[in-house]
Amino acid sequence: MKKTVIFTLLCVLLAMPAMAQPGYRYSRPRIQTVGHHGNEYVAWHRYYFGLRLGMNASHVSSDSPVLDGNGVKTGLNLGFAAGTQLTYRAPIFLESGLYYSQKGGKSGSGQDKFTYDLNYLEVPLLIKYKHFVGNQTSIQPYAGGYLAIGTDGSIKNYGSRTAFSSFDDGYFNRFDGGLKLGCGVGFNMLYVDASYDIGLSNIGQDDFNDTHNGCFTINIGVNF
C-alpha cells in the first residue's frame, strides 16, 4: 500500500510541469497610479502549482504511558500544492494540495521500546501572504488547517518482538485533523518552507485515549 501511494504521487508530480498553464510570473508586483489618487495593486501570480519534497519530525502525545514519550520519528513528506490569489488588492493566496505524510513516534527504550508508524494522505487548506523582498524573493507566512486519512502503518513492540497494524487492529483512528502554521521563502521558481502541525483530533482508540499528532516539517520544491 505504501509503495503504491508513493508511486502514484510521484507520477502525478512528474506530470504536473507538463500540465501547468502559464500564470506564474517571477517579478515584484507592478504598481499602477490612477489619476492623482493613491496607488492600486495590479494582479500578479494569479495562481500557481508546486511540487514538494521534505522530511517530517513527528511525535505523539497521549495520556497512555505506552505512547506518550519524547521519541521523535522521522519520515517522508511528498506531494503537490496549488494556490490562487484571493484579491487583486493584496498578495493574499488560498493554497491546498495533496501530500503523503509519514508520521508517528517512539516511546520507551530497550525491552520497553515501542515505535508506531502512522502514514496519511493529507489535504491542507491555508491562507498565505507573500511579502516581496527584492525582485524575485518573497517571504510567505501562512496559517490554516489540515485533514488526513490514514493509509497504512505499524506498531512495533521490541520487547515481545511483535508488530501490529496501526489502523486495522483498532489502535488508532484513521482520521486526523488540526492546525498548520508555517512560513516559506520563494526565490524565482524555487521554494522552501518549515511548518508545524498541531493535531486536534483524538487519533487513539481503546487504551490509547486522548492521543494527538504533532509534526514539524521542512519542505523544498518548485512552483510553476
Residue ranges: model-predicted function:
Residues 61-67, 106-112, 153-161, 204-209:
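Outer-membrane beta-barrel translocator domains and adjoining extracellular loop/strand segments
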Residues 16-20:
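Sec/Tat signal peptide C-region and signal peptidase I cleavage site
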Residues 21-74:
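Short glycine/proline- and aromatic-enriched beta-strand/turn motifs that initiate or cap beta-hairpins
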Residues 24, 189, 212-224:
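Outer-membrane beta-barrel "beta-signal"
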Residues 51, 78-80, 98, 123-127, ...:
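Membrane-embedded beta-strands of outer-membrane beta-barrel proteins
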Residues 4-14:
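Sec-dependent N-terminal signal peptides
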Residues 86-92, 113-203, 224:
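Outer-membrane beta-barrel transmembrane domain signature
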